Curated annotation (Swiss-Prot):
A UniProt-annotated Pfam family: GATase_3
HAMAP family per record: CobQ
Chain ranges of the GATase cobBQ-type domain: 256-444
Key words of the record: Cobalamin biosynthesis, Glutamine amidotransferase
Family recorded in the similarity comment: Belongs to the CobB/CobQ family. CobQ subfamily.
Protein name: Cobyric acid synthase
């Protein structure tokens, strides 16, 4: 039987240094080595969220890490989720349920922080009682000293957990010595003793040229460098932050089915399109350029954290009109969640759930109307797509109800296992749904691509098997470049 390991926290010198991916790697490594790991991030800020089996909401990154760990996701893995709804305001989701909107000043004030701290501590304690080890992820930089008193997620959380902290730094962006040394030295002495190792991430070139740098960092900081992990391009793990959209295709291609995702300002759950991005039959691109939209065979309207605001922008910049024109000229248009709402006759928000806009006309492609409501629907679903007999899976996360207009027939896109119906189907070129993850189902993708048979030179692939292969590749990559015996020693040391 394996020993109990201390919790392991992957903290960072800054944002986007690779904490989430390294945490996923260790979740898979511990699983491969016979442990029963689980991920944990006390507070996450992201638009990409996921519905747990209990119908509650967590950050998508922790759902991915749970998948790497081979366990079902749970709200205890991410008890506090912030979903930005504007540049200054976020929806606060506590233990999987929204508790209201807060601006940054209100959220980081000391009043109320201790109640939130108790909640995230309790979530960790429940998780630690069930799993060994807990793989924790910090947020942003560990040395934001102006926010020290209100920090719920970095060193204060590690101290509560009794975690060993590995500091992750991104050498690719430059300044790694200053960022590592500065991060360590800005910590209080009682915090600093929890830093047990440094991991240099995203290294390019010959690692032998950095051997002297490793020694310098160890001498400066007084802790070992537990690994130098090279940059990779051939491992595909779901990404958490929409900043990664900057690396995606932005133009139509040739020789494949051109699928355009409309680039909304408040786009959420862009992971809905991961399968299409890997499908060899498809050229997926993200755009709000009207000329590029006209080249698309299929246009996908994604989810939005602020549907009315995005609808206003689409009408203002001409994208709404371009989508309607493209559909009239033969393009398939499909909306998911907020995108489904956008496709209807109108979107109404009389109770100001989203903001000040009370009503806007939609694109008019679907004979439905949406009314925003304060209660959020969050659940995993099983369903049949149209009349197909295959059982599909997905999840719902939305605020608002969408209903057909009074003078049109009921024409659902999906028949849910609990007897409910979802979405609206006009014909195979025009449809909408509330189900995120609908495009993870092969039968749905095959249906969308079937009219473009002249472009289909490749075959589809098994996405679930593909993801498992990628987790194993990631684990092998990290295992090769870290001192795993040293890390196990750290996690079992009684000092």
């Amino acid at each position: 039987m394996n020993k109990n390991l201390h919790p392991l926290m992957l903290a960072g010198t800054g944002s986007d240094v690779g904490k989430s991916i390294i945490a996923a790697a260790f979740c898979r490594i511990f699983l491969q080595d016979g442990y029963h790991p689980a991920p944990f991030k006390a507070q996450n800020m992201a638009l990409n969220s996921y519905a747990t089996p209990e119908g509650l909401e967590i950050g998508r990154a922790q759902a991915v890490q749970a998948e790497a760990a081979g366990v079902p996701c749970h709200t205890d893995m991410n008890p506090l989720l912030l979903k930005p709804s504007s540049d200054h305001t976020s929806q606060v989701v506590l233990n999987g349920r929204p508790i209201g909107n807060r601006n940054a000043y209100e959220y980081f004030r000391r009043e109320g922080r201790e109640e939130l701290r108790k909640e995230v501590h309790a979530a960790f304690d429940r998780l630690a009682a069930r799993y060994n080890p807990v793989v924790m992820e910090g947020a942003g930089s560990i040395s934001e000293i102006n926010l020290r008193d209100s920090d719920l997620v970095n060193l204060p959380m590690a101290m509560h957990a009794g975690a060993d902290v590995i500091l992750v730094a991104d050498i690719d962006r430059g300044g790694v010595f200053a960022s590592v040394y500065g991060s360590v030295m800005l910590l209080r002495p009682e915090e600093r003793k929890h830093i047990k190792g440094i991991l240099i991430n995203k290294f390019r070139g010959d690692i032998r040229l950095f051997e002297s740098g490793v020694k310098m960092l160890e001498d400066l900081c007084g802790v070992p460098v537990v690994g130098v992990v090279p940059y990779y391009k051939d491992i595909y793990i779901e990404e958490e932050d929409s900043v990664m959209l900057q690396t995606k295709n932005i133009r139509a291609g040739q020789g494949k089915v051109n699928v355009a995702v409309v680039l909304l300002r408040h786009l959420s759950n862009f992971t809905d399109f991961n399968v299409l991005e890997r499908d060899p039959r498809v050229h997926l691109f993200y755009t709000n350029n009207t000329d590029e939209l006209m080249k698309a065979d299929i246009i996908l309207l994604p989810g939005s954290k602020s549907t009315l605001s995005d609808l206003y922008e689409l009408r203002r910049n001409g994208v709404a009109q371009a989508i309607v024109r493209a559909h009239r000229e033969g393009a398939t248009v499909m909306g998911i969640c907020g995108g489904y709402q956008l496709m209807g006759r109108e979107v109404c928000d009389p109770d100001h759930v989203e903001g000040e806009i009370e009503r806007l006309p939609g694109l008019g492609l679907l004979p439905v109307s949406t009314r925003m409501q304060g209660e959020k629907v969050t659940r995993q679903v099983r369903f049949r797509f149209l009349e197909d007999s295959a059982v599909c899976e997905g999840y719902e996360i939305h605020m608002g109800t969408t209903t057909p207009l009074a003078d049109v027939p009921v024409s659902p896109l999906n028949h849910l296992a609990d007897g409910r119906e979802d979405g609206y189907f006009v014909d195979r070129t025009c449809m909408g749904t509330y189900v995120h993850g609908i495009l993870d189902n092969p039968s749905v993708i095959d249906y969308l691509l079937e009219p473009f048979a002249d472009k289909l030179k490749e075959t589809a692939f098994d996405y679930k098997a593909f993801k498992e292969e990628q987790y194993d590749k990631l684990a092998a990559h990290v295992r090769k470049h870290v001192d795993l015996p040293l890390i196990y020693q750290i996690l079992t040391d009684n000092d």
